[in-house]
Amino acid sequence: MIQQVIVVEGKSDIARVRQAVDADLIATGGYALRSAVIQDIRAAYEKRGIIILTDPDGPGEKIRSRLSVMFPEALHAFVPKSEASTEDDVGIENASPESVRKALDKVRILYQESSHEFHMEDLWNSSLTGAEDATGKRASVGAILGIGYGNAKQFLRRLNHFGITRKEWESALAEYGRKYERR
C-alpha cells in the first residue's frame, strides 16, 4: 500500500487509480475545492503526506497549482497527456493502470526555491524550444523525467523546482533519442 494519500479530481479517477495501486484517495471534486475536501486533504497531508495526481489538462494544472500553494511539501505525479487521452477527453480515468503506476513511481517534490540548474539555453541546445516539434519533445522528455508537460517557460520552471539533476536531464535526453529519433 502506498503510504501517502493520493489526491485526484473525481470519482472516475479514484476508480482508475485503485485498478493500478493499493492506496487511499481523495477526490477534489473539481477546482471549487469545498472546505470539507480541503480539511480532508489537510488531515491526510499532516498525517501521511499526499501525492497530487491531477489530469494533464488546463483545469488539472490549475488544481495542482492551487493545492501546491496550500500543501507545499506535497509530492507530485504526472501521467502524460498522450497516455491519459481518448478522442475527446483527457483525464486520469483514461490512463491505463500501467501509466498510473509509472507516474507514481516517479513522484517528485516541488521545491519552493529554484535550483537555477537549468536555463533557457539548455532548452534551445536540446531542441526543446525554437525547433520543429519542440512541443512534442518537451512532452516526451517531461514524461521520462516524471514532471509533466509545459510550455518552454513552464518546463524550465519544473526542471528547476522539481530538483532535476544534470545526470537525470542527460539520461532523459538520451532515452528520448533512443526511443524517438531513430524511427
What are these regions (language model features)?
Residues Q4, K11-K47:
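Acidic, glycine-rich catalytic loops of TOPRIM or P-loop NTPase phosphate-binding modules used
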Residues K11-S12, G29-Y31, D55-D57, V79-A84:
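Short, ordered loop/turn segments at secondary-structure junctions
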Residues K102, Y111, H116-R183:
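C-terminal, charge/polar-rich interaction regions
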Residues I50-K62, K102-L110:
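Short, basic, helix/turn surface patches
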Residues R66-E113:
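Long, charge-dense
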Residues R16, K62-R66:
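Phosphate- and divalent-cation-binding pockets in alpha/beta enzyme and binding domains
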Residues V7-E9, K47-P59, F78:
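Acidic beta-strand-to-loop metal/phosphate-binding motif
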Residues D24-L25, I50, A74-L75:
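Hydrophobic anchor at the start of a short beta-strand
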